[in-house]
Amino acid sequence: MATSAAAKDDDSPATRFAVDQLRSIIERIERLEEEKKAISEDIKDVYAESKGNGFDVKALRTIIRLRKQDPNERQEEESILETYMQALGMV
């Protein structure tokens, strides 16, 4: 008998709305994941193209990472790296 009460609750407008909303969210995420996959493949192709043109992919990735950083954070990181390298006699 508890099952029939649960079935009635499942047919309520609020439940249908929640289910529809959940389905919509899941489908949006799935579409975005597909787009992300396509973009990742495009980025990989650009790196392969740059390598074919003689560019160092590791250096390009480093530049991309550095450009994303806040200038102050980047300066602090570079300063710490310089300090450590000096301490190890690498500079």
Swiss-Prot record:
GO terms for molecular function: DNA binding. It comes from the Bacteria. Belongs to the UPF0335 family. This is UPF0335 protein BBta_6866. It comes from Bradyrhizobium sp. (strain BTAi1 / ATCC BAA-1182).
